[in-house]
């Protein structure tokens, strides 16, 4: 198993070869999110509202899987960089075991407590019924989500981006095909409504899980050993990176829930608008997030190999690529806001409110590229806490007080302005944190 190309191949071709498969797969995943919302919106406005309210918990489950997977990825990549194959294998085995445990716990907790969560935001019996039905089905697949994503991050740590791209695309396409069939029915298959959307999502997540089990048997160069499963040697290192990374990804769920609580006091329309925006934001941000996923193992490997100058070059290139993507996203939202929002709602009030929200919030995209890049590189270096500080600024410390104060002055529009104000301040903080850690760690 030779990963030397990670420290010898020219930077631009290396980053592109690692990132483009991830960008493509993340774009397909974003398309799934949009298609899912598109079909649910055709059921009713209440169904879309229910989906918007359940989304933060779904995001939390995925955040735990991806966040802990980032820890697994970083630890394995680091040990591969130091050429310690056994430690890479042992950390992989313990990472998979912990992911399985996370999945079982999340499934039980989320299925039991979803009614209480939804009642905090709405008393509408139809929305409650739809939300509980959708949530309980979707949460039943928590185990396959956790273990499947752990396998994905393991393969990414080995530089096997093309394989993870293919598997993710297969899962997403499965979901997209099943959505209209299970929601509206086809031939002998009955219409299941919002429950069909949840089942389609679950099947789309199970297919990659099964494929990863198959490829582990025939293709993975790292193996699971019984003695590694009986040890806790790498738990601290895995959680030391995984917990901050999980919080980084989970914090948007906290933000959405708090903003929903602020917006619902004005109208349920604004809750729907926020839910639609986050689906659209996923589409805009996923290319940048795909690049970040691609460079994490590069950063970890080069850090283990003490190739510090290459890490700095990777950071600068990633920032430039992210800026280009975010500028394009901002232009789309400014020029075509009505057309974009119109894909998800025909309600005139919701459409008008969404156009205003999209134009204001999209100002923040360009500034967010600095925060995303800095946080991603820091995670690749195994520096979870500094990355978490950046995310806390983006999703809690600055935006929540800002949204509360501005909403009291400007109404719902104040919440939208809080996004770009937060990103401006966080961009400055991110740059300062990264420069300090760079100086402390490798004197560049």
Where are these regions (language model features)?
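Transmembrane alpha-helix boundary and packing residues in multipass membrane permease domains
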Residues: 22, 26, 38, 74, ...
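Small-residue-rich hydrophobic transmembrane alpha-helices
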Residues: 48-108, 112, 145-164, 260, ...
């Amino acid at each position: 198993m030779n990963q030397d190309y990670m420290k010898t191949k020219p930077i631009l071709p290396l980053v592109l070869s690692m990132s483009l498969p991830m960008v493509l797969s993340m774009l397909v995943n974003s398309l799934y999110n949009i298609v899912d919302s598109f079909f649910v919106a055709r059921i009713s406005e209440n169904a879309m509202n229910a989906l918007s309210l359940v989304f933060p918990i779904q995001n939390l489950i995925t955040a735990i899987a991806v966040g802990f997977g980032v820890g697994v990825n970083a630890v394995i990549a680091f040990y591969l960089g130091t050429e310690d194959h056994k430690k890479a294998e042992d950390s992989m085995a313990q990472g998979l075991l912990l992911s399985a445990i996370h999945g079982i716990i999340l499934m039980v907790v989320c299925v039991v407590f979803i009614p209480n969560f939804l009642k905090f935001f709405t008393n509408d019996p139809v929305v409650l019924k739809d939300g509980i039905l959708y949530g309980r089905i979707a949460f039943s697949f928590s185990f396959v989500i956790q273990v499947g994503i752990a396998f994905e991050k393991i393969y990414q740590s080995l530089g096997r981006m093309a394989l993870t791209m293919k598997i993710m695309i297969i899962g997403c396409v499965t979901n997209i095909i099943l959505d209209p069939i299970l929601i509206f029915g086809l031939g002998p298959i009955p219409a299941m409504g919002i429950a069909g959307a949840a089942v389609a999502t679950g099947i789309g997540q199970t297919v990659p899980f099964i494929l990863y089990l198959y490829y582990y048997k025939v293709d993975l160069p790292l193996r699971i050993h019984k003695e590694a499963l009986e040890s806790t040697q790498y738990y601290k290192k895995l959680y030391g990176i995984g917990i901050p990374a999980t919080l980084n990804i989970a914090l948007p769920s906290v933000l959405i829930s708090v903003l929903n609580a602020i917006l619902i006091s004005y109208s349920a329309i604004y809750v729907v608008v926020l839910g639609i925006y986050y689906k659209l934001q996923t589409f805009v941000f996923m290319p940048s997030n795909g690049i970040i996923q691609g460079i994490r193992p590069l950063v970890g490997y080069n850090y283990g190999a003490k190739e510090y100058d290459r890490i700095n070059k990777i950071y600068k290139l990633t920032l430039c690529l992210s800026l280009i993507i975010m500028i394009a996203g901002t232009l789309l939202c400014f020029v075509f806001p009505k057309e974009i929002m119109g894909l998800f709602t025909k309600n005139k009030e919701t459409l008008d409110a969404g156009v205003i929200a999209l134009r204001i919030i999209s100002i923040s995209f360009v500034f967010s590229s600095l925060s995303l890049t800095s946080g991603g590189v820091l995670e690749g270096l195994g520096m979870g806490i500094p990355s978490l500080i950046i995310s806390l600024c983006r999703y809690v410390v600055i935006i929540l007080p800002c949204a509360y104060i501005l909403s009291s002055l400007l109404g719902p529009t104040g919440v939208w302005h809080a996004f770009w104000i937060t990103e401006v301040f966080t961009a400055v903080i991110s740059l300062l944190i990264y420069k300090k850690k760079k100086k402390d760690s490798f004197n560049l």
